[in-house]
Amino acid sequence: MKPCLLLLALLLGGCASLDTPRVPSQALPAANSAFGRDLQAQAAAYQGRSGFRLLPNGGEAFRARAELIRNARTSLDLQYYIVHDGLSTRLLVDELLKAADRGVRVRILLDDTTSDGLDDIIATLAAHPHIQIRLFNPLDLGRSTLATRTLGRLFNLNLQHRRMHNKLWLADNSAAIVGGRNLGDEYFGAQQDLNFTDIDMLSVGPVAEQLGHSFDQYWNSALSKPIGEFLSRQPTASDLAETRERLVRSLIAWRQRNAALYQRLADYQYHPRMDTWRRELIWAWNQALWDSPSKVLAQDEPDPRLLLTTQLSPVLTSVHSELMMISAYFVPGQPGLVYLTGRADAGVSVSLLTNSLEATDVPAVHGGYAPYRKALLEHGVKLYELRRQPGDRSGSGPHLFHSGSSKGSDSSLHSKAMIFDRQKAFIGSFNFDPRSVLWNTEVGVLVDSPELAEHVRTLALQGMAPALSYEPRLEAGELVWVTEDNGQIHVLHREPGSWWRRINAWLTKRVGLERML
């Protein structure tokens, strides 16, 4: 196709759209629902503190989302970077539709990368009178084909490479889930080939209202547009009914095809655990942190006043004894290198758990991280790179955080957490890399609780264990990797990882893509 014709196709692909009303809305008061009032009554005894429970297990993280849908009476607000199709997603969509049937207002805000080529399917759900769906930072033109979408993003790369990386699940403005998980089987231990090890956190009380303010800022931003704006025809009630019938049939087929997986995921329907989790809550002071949605509009580096990192800066600079970090995608850049080595030089014990080359799902990011290893190690920063954790068919392979992954599946790190002086812990969507700092928007919660911090620290130490990780060290100025197999310590002089991964990581270094990672 000639350039002029391709440009014409791009323009025509965005012309056939409808003028969809964009009405501002806000989170509904927690007191409007029985569930919200019940949680408010539980929180009242803690005088402004919020309640937290970690969800490091993929099965629990899925169950918590499903149970929050079932408990919701007035509102559900969902904000996600990625939504992948699969059994877990279909079960959650089925529950969301049932919640909408009983009058719950459902607002779903998706980063536009989620909806590439799926506008009609996603919009069909919005045909329900109680479901609203918006896209953040959408591609306005050329959505009709893969070629025109790709060209459209290239024409406006400065804006289109900036994404909403937030992950938030909020029920009745009174209970929320924050953390690193997107939506898809691989995030809930339900994928057959690869699952992500991650950390979420159930958060109830005042913190949920803070996170509700965060959601409202994004929902009402000029960057968030109703899915209907990108359709040539609005889905009807009959379209929705047909979609629901297909959904039910697909769930029946899933149950017949993989009964064990279906029963494991659907167990929330028969054995709810919300009451148990509420008894296990750790009550503590906290601060919900998020980037301003207008961060993505910056022409170059964003205004520091808009950033989550600016809000987190006081605790980053005041750490004095121990800093532990879990960052699946770690690229410190020069500012991060100066910060981490400066803390280590000041006597702070600094340790980091990230993915190894063989485990990462994005080898290019490893290419951005690898050049910093020697400098970090020379200043005493401890590095641990999670090994690819193969699960054999009997399920005996090691799995970090007791993830409950499908038997036979490998595991890769996707977690994002920081522990400061064994006193405070930060859980959210933020990776220690330029993309989280400069380009994408993020959300998380800083909790002031030695008890919770110790729980997160224990998870970090579990991942840093020799049997689960490679520890890079310097021997005569060269990198070696120390690990353990069958109780025996081994020193590797060549970094583990396939030739394809090595080439991918090497190309990233050669091309100089660090600031985009």
Regions found by a protein language model. Name each.
Residues C4-G13:
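Bacterial N-terminal signal peptides
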Residues C15-K167, A171-L517:
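Charged, low-complexity intrinsically disordered terminal segments
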